[in-house]
Amino acid sequence: MKAQELRTKNVEELKAELINLLGEQFKLRMQAATGQLQQTHQLKQVRRSIAQVKTVLNQKAGE
């Protein structure tokens, strides 16, 4: 998801997105630990998405 799309969402939607991404990251980590993860780039994408959501949340908190 692009940063511009994230900025249009409200705080509740961003928090829900963050919880969703953290759950997805947990699942991917478990798959990587057990050797079932085929597409390892997904870990990086999810980690980056989490950082983007947290950044937008912090920006909105400062407003």
From Swiss-Prot:
**Domain of life, per the record?**
Bacteria
Query: What is an example of a Pfam family matching this protein?
Result: Ribosomal_L29
What does the UniProt keyword field contain? Ribonucleoprotein, Ribosomal protein
Record-linked CDD domains? Ribosomal_L29_HIP
The residue stretches assigned to a coiled coil in this entry are none
Q: Name one GO cellular component term.
A: cytosolic large ribosomal subunit
Q: What protein is this chain from?
A: Large ribosomal subunit protein uL29
What species is this protein from?
Answer: Haemophilus ducreyi (strain 35000HP / ATCC 700724)
